[in-house]
Amino acid sequence: MFGSSRGGVRGGQDQFNWEDVKTDKQRENYLGNSLMAPVGRWQKGRDLTWYAKDRAPCTGPSREEELAAVREAEREALLAALGYKNVRKQPTGLSKEDFVEICKREGGDPEEKGVDRLLGLGSASGSAGRVALSREDKEAAKLGLSVFTHHRVDSEGPSTAPSATRKKPRAEDKAELDAESHKKSKKEKKKKKKKHKKHKKKKDKEHKREADSCSSSPSPARPRRQRHSDFSPCYKRKREHSQDSGRNPSHRRQDRSSDD
């Protein structure tokens, strides 16, 4: 009717003992994986309290040392920004690929260029002027890379032809020259158009002035055309009558007396 009674003590702490739990056959029914009484083969012979033991000391710098290093770096950066400290830039040397590229740009082989055949930065004369850097060299200088500015020296000496020292124009230089010439031609065309417009405006103004002067001056009197009616007999009679009426009355009386 009732199940089998299990072993163990249901009393207080004074009646409980861990050794009895370890030796009990039915401990898995009421006890989990406890550190005091490990159950199963995975817990036997293992250090189950490894996390509670002290760890090995760290070999890296402590937090205080790291904070002190950060503060020092910030102080140096602030002094450099304010100008109280000179920033020393470490020059980066040319790599082999950069050296080969520069030699190709100048048109010579890197093996032919020895140390004896190269001029240093201070060996150029004062009249030689500054070295014209290409676009790639300028970009490299902006990034902080060292620019190769040496020039090849011929064995003939300083009396070499200037044409030999000149570099061949590259495609980029040609493109820049073409763009500049195109801009100049555009500007010239604009100037010509402006001049043509000004000249045209002047001509129009002169024509307007002439037309105004002609309209303001009195037109010459045209000869009056004789109408066909002037030669008609009716017109002649009217004319004679007007002439007779315009005479003096004394003349009219004389005419009448003569008629009588």
Curated annotation (Swiss-Prot):
Biased composition (Low complexity): 117-132
Sequence ranges of Basic and acidic residues compositional bias: 106-116, 170-182
Composition bias, Basic residues: 183-206
Cross-link (Glycyl lysine isopeptide (Lys-Gly) (interchain with G-Cter in SUMO2)): K22, K104, K113
Bias-annotated ranges (Gly residues): 1-11
InterPro entries: MMTA2_N (IPR019315), MMTAG2-like (IPR039207)
Region (Disordered): 1-21, 106-133, 148-260
Modified residues (Phosphoserine): S123, S127, S215, S216, S219
Key words of the record: Isopeptide bond, Phosphoprotein, Ubl conjugation
Pfam families: MMtag (PF10159)
PANTHER family in the record: MULTIPLE MYELOMA TUMOR-ASSOCIATED PROTEIN 2, MULTIPLE MYELOMA TUMOR-ASSOCIATED PROTEIN 2 FAMILY MEMBER
Protein's name in the database: Multiple myeloma tumor-associated protein 2 homolog
Species this protein is from: Rattus norvegicus
